[in-house]
């Protein structure tokens, strides 16, 4: 945990400071929904930052991301007028799509499910057993939508971007706008892959947080909305996974 925190702090600090030193006027810092307190109300609003204790298992990563947000805000305050510095931060929800990590031991939920259901389909396995009750709710955003949102935020006039926050709370959430249960997600993945066997859940295994849903109303109010629904996004993600198998 110590090395992880150190490396994340150093990477972003070097990038942000080097950007300033080399005359980079605009920069975007990508955070994570884990910056918000463990017990924050749902959906997660930008104003909830630093209002409570963090989730212990994610604390080093969250602290690094919070530091990056505050570093961007502080550089804006110190160097905004003198050097035209305009460093912005966005907080994405759970992302998925082409280019994801499908490793069986350290992938996130969607690529993990894609791999498992694909292997079950190929082997004609009659059942796929998923850890947990399937009841926790999560929000997912297709990677192309995240890229589009990032460009949208970077292209905003500075006065418009600044008017939707304050100098020390300038980050913007980027989410899909609705969430699904893990059980619903599993069935969506199975449909995208064409797996027709049984899907079961092992409720003796831990579930994690019951819900994690971003409030993206600030970004929506600026005029941006996601374009790729979950079903279409999963089909695209699966085709990308098949491509990795042929490499």
Regions found by a protein language model. Name each.
Residues 14-17, 38, 56-93, 112-124:
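Active-site Tyr-X1-5-Lys
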Residues 4, 43-45, 96, 102, ...:
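Short clusters of hydrophobic/aromatic residues that line enzyme substrate/ligand-binding pockets
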Residues 38-40, 98-101, 218:
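Short beta-loop-alpha junction of Rossmann-like oxidoreductase domains
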Residues 2, 57-61, 93-108, 132-145, ...:
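Glycine-rich "substrate-gating" loop/helix at the edge of Rossmann-like oxidoreductase active sites
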Residues 119-247:
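C-terminal substrate-binding subdomain of Rossmann-fold SDR/epimerase-dehydratase oxidoreductases
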């Amino acid at each position: 945990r110590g090395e992880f925190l150190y490396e994340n702090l150093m990477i972003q600090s070097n990038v942000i400071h080097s950007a300033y030193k080399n005359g980079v006027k605009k920069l975007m810092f990508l955070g994570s929904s884990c910056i918000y307190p463990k017990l924050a109300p749902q959906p997660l609003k930008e104003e909830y930052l630093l209002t409570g204790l963090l989730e212990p298992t994610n604390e080093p990563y969250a602290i690094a991301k919070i530091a990056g947000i505050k570093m961007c805000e502080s550089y804006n305050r110190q160097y905004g007028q003198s050097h035209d510095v305009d460093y912005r931060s966005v907080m994405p929800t759970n992302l998925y799509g082409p280019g994801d990590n499908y490793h069986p031991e350290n992938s996130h939920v969607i690529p993990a499910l894609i791999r498992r259901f694909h292997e079950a389909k190929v082997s004609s396995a009659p059942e796929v057993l998923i850890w947990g009750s399937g009841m926790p709710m999560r929000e997912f955003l297709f990677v192309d939508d995240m890229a589009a949102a990032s460009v949208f935020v970077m292209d905003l006039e500075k006065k418009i971007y600044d008017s939707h926050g304050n100098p020390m709370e300038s980050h913007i959430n980027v989410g899909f706008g609705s969430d699904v249960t893990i059980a619903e997600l599993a069935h969506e993945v199975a449909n995208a892959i064409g797996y027709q066997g049984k899907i079961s859940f092992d409720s003796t295994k831990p579930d994690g947080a019951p819900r994690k849903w971003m409030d993206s109303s600030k970004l929506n109010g600026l005029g941006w909305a996601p374009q790729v629904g979950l079903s279409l996004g999963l089909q695209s993600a699966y085709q990308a996974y098949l491509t990795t198998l042929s490499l």
